């Protein structure tokens, strides 16, 4: 499909076959409890994964937080980020960023008293997710960052801090 319909992008998409396979496993749910069955044709898949490839441009979701909030969160994220952290350690750092910036790291506390917080840790994750992928909804962000690589992730976040 790619060679016939997107010949200029085929070389980009298939340049690193292991990366492409990791992306497809993530998006198709290979090895997961439930596999995706909603893709009707290849173009849908490549539209969803286009953000992995530099030079790809597409529609970006808007940040729901104010610009100064986003910049503070992204600066804290880059300062705390360690590519060697496992998913649990990484998420705990997101919780620390939430606490530092006035967001709830504990969803029970947030649900009990939402007025005490600017938002919750999911707002922190969403800001990072949009900066990295351009989308508010994606599969597991930690996995995306590890497939993408630290350098590409950092470059994308720094674009939003300027």
Which residues fall in each region the model found?
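Conserved nucleotide- and phosphate/pyrophosphate-binding catalytic cores
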Residues: 1-162
